[in-house]
Amino acid sequence: MLNIGCHLSSSKGYKAMGKDAISINANTFQFFTRNPRGSKAKAMDLKDVEGLLQLMEENKFAKILAHAPYTLNPCSADERTREFAMEVLVDDLARMEYLPNNFYNFHPGNHLKQGVEVGIEYIVNSLNDVLKPDQTTTVLLETMSGKGTEIGKNFEELKQIIDGIKLSNKVGVCLDTCHVYDAGYDIVQDLDGVIQEFDRIIGLDKLYAIHLNDSKNPFASHKDRHAKIGEGYIGEEGIVRIINHPKLRHLPFFLETPNDLEGHGEEIKMLREAYRDESIL
């Protein structure tokens, strides 16, 4: 079964997101834990959360993915920005325990000309401070496009972060197809080679989720602009190869394409039709 969903608005609550997912034939979804450009998070409505959990169980949902706000930058040169990142991480991971055994994804951050090594050290220290042995949430580092001073533009940087984390069993990777293509990993012409490189450097056992996006910009552009499936440089054929790849097909896929709910439903319909049943592979 193809486990696929899209990014959904949390403005109407948790159960409403589950209902929206079901309405477009999705069996998972992604959401922001708080305003993506701000710091405030809504109070948890436990009845609403319980409603979502029940709906997920009844409809056999895959794990869902919470996304940290874009303002989170644990490797900033500014101490207050790093402190804010810590506060958000602590709060978000505590809130995620009301939605146990799911994923929490964040952008590693921008080192802002301090250098990659300094930035990675800050990220490692932050995660070592916030991760707990008894947490049920797996924290995912997102692959980045290499825009500006982003950390996570190559597999080696993500590996270095993971290697520095004491509770590394609580951490994994979310691969963004647009980001890796823009970063210079040719998933169109050499998908097998990219997967082998990921496995060699990080290990496929650390790959937990995929952001499924086409790219508005050409290969190795370091731009990070998502396109609708089939309307970018990766193309529909390239995306279909990804969801059917034997090393990836079991993972949950999350669309972040510039679409409304109906548009995401159309993409999901197309991808479900293109997904080959394992029994005929």
From Swiss-Prot:
Residue ranges the record marks as coiled coil: none
Binding site for Zn(2+) 1: 67, 107, 142
PANTHER family reported for this sequence: APURINIC-APYRIMIDINIC ENDONUCLEASE, ENDONUCLEASE IV ENDODEOXYRIBONUCLEASE IV
Keyword field: DNA damage, DNA repair, Endonuclease, Hydrolase, Metal-binding, Nuclease, Zinc
Enzyme type, top EC level: hydrolase
NCBIfam families cross-referenced by the UniProt entry: nfo
Residues engaged in binding Zn(2+) 3: 179, 224, 226
Cofactor note: Binds 3 Zn(2+) ions.
EC number of this enzyme: 3.1.21.2
Enzymatic reactions: Endonucleolytic cleavage to 5'-phosphooligonucleotide end-products
Organism encoding this protein: Alkaliphilus oremlandii (strain OhILAs)
GO molecular function: deoxyribonuclease IV (phage-T4-induced) activity; DNA binding; DNA-(apurinic or apyrimidinic site) endonuclease activity; phosphoric diester hydrolase activity; zinc ion binding
Pfam families: AP_endonuc_2
Family: Belongs to the AP endonuclease 2 family.
Listed name of the protein: Probable endonuclease 4
Binding annotation for Zn(2+) 2: 142, 176, 211, 256
Function recorded in the entry: Endonuclease IV plays a role in DNA repair. It cleaves phosphodiester bonds at apurinic or apyrimidinic (AP) sites, generating a 3'-hydroxyl group and a 5'-terminal sugar phosphate.
Names of required cofactors: Zn(2+)
Gene Ontology process terms (BP): base-excision repair
InterPro entries reported for this sequence: AP_endonuc_2, AP_endonuc_F2_Zn_BS, Xyl_isomerase-like_sf, Xyl_isomerase-like_TIM-brl
